[in-house]
Amino acid sequence: MRVVILGSGVVGVTSAWYLSQAGHDVTVIDRESGPAQGTSAANAGQISPGYAAPWAAPGVPLKAIKWMFQRHAPLAVRLDGTPFQLKWMWQMLRNCDTRHYMENKGRMVRLAEYSRDCLKTLRAETGIKYEGRQGGTLQLFRTARQYENATRDIAVLEDAGVPYQLLESSRLAEVEPALAEVAHKLTGGLRLPNDETGDCQLFTQRLAHMAEQAGVTFRFNTPVEKLLYENEQIYGVKCADEIIKADAYVMAFGSYSTAMLKGIVDIPVYPLKGYSLTIPIVEPDGAPVSTILDETYKIAITRFDKRIRVGGMAEIVGFNTDLQQPRRETLEMVVRDLFPRGGRIEQATFWTGLRPMTPDGTPVVGRTRFKNLWLNTGHGTLGWTMACGSGQLLSDILSGRTPAIPYDDLSIARYRSDFAPSRQQRLHSAHN
């Protein structure tokens, strides 16, 4: 089967790899000059299935109000008055109760755990190198309440069979020696020993090269104008004066998926702006061994070979990609506070990207009402964590094979009543 994939980020490239391995003739289209030039370029670098959790959580609405008045707040909102933003935020608020949180986190952990298994298999079969480490993740708590609240997440971890260690502050240095100097500032931590880290951009670029050698065609510097469709079936992708045809089409454009599908399939994927710093390491002993998650500021600090990646925060500001100096100051403050000897902050590279987020935090993976249009988008802050599993899952569904995990609750059907274009809308769009 001929398959066109729209998007060459980590999700698009893993989809291409697994579909190619299943015997399909795959073409990837992207406006960028190469793979992983957008959100996959400089994310936090963590592969953390156990910490897969929605931003929509109990207490977040009240916290969001408090964060409005804090300099180093992890979340910022700028209302633009658009119906889509308001509808998306309302949907997110509706998911901020305990029942929805547990349900959403459960399916996110399911997909993320499966994805880690897929990555492990891929690594063993191909030998792909991406500055990966298998040293686990350590979530740090600064207050007694944070430490106590960890029991809520532990219940989900136990249900999913995810191993963990709940550590008091005196034991943090056992897994992250550099924290010995700052343990007095912390109340404890939750460690997931099976989690991993790695450079997402490097992985994506090298996997794209392997996919190309396996027969995948990459069409870079090729902006997509629109999808062409009739009778609820896609019949081509319009790119300037060219129409690229296939038997099946996969939307993996991240935050830009929503606009590209307007009038065809409405999906609740909104750009959640995040930031990162990439810092050269000065003293290896003063840097983290693996990944640290600061629960207070929602910031991750990840060790690569000779660099530290500090990433986090969320801004609901539309497609704005301006680099905000106060956000850099927050990232610098956290890494200086926890790893004062870790790296040369003055030489850091500052970056921002747009994560494609759904209101419930779970991606949308699977077929749409269109017979040959498939989705693999909406992974939010967990695109790197979920990419391999999502790609393998999509390949299995599209190929008619039985997937290794349940997947019905990952499809767009769960949003159909709230995000669905009318028949009149679709007919109008089809004739424009």
Curated annotation (Swiss-Prot):
Which EC class, in a word?
A: oxidoreductase
Give the SUPFAM superfamilies listed for this entry. FAD-linked reductases, C-terminal domain, FAD/NAD(P)-binding domain
| Residues given in the record as FAD binding sites | 3-17
So what does this thing catalyse?
a D-alpha-amino acid + A + H2O = a 2-oxocarboxylate + AH2 + NH4(+)
Q: Which Gene3D superfamilies match?
A: D-Amino Acid Oxidase, subunit A, domain 2, FAD/NAD(P)-binding domain
Q: Which GO terms describe its cellular component?
A: cytoplasm; plasma membrane
Q: What is this protein called in UniProt?
A: D-amino acid dehydrogenase
Role summary: Oxidative deamination of D-amino acids.
Cofactor(s), names only, from the UniProt record: FAD
Q: Which family does it belong to?
A: Belongs to the DadA oxidoreductase family.
Please provide the Gene Ontology terms (biological process) for this protein. D-alanine catabolic process
Name the UniProt key words of this record, in alphabetical order: FAD, Flavoprotein, Oxidoreductase
- In terms of superkingdom, the source organism counts as Bacteria
Q: What is its EC number?
A: 1.4.99.-
What GO MF annotations does this protein's record show? D-amino-acid dehydrogenase activity
Q: Hey, which pathway is this one from?
A: Amino-acid degradation; D-alanine degradation; NH(3) and pyruvate from D-alanine: step 1/1
Q: Which Pfam families match?
A: DAO
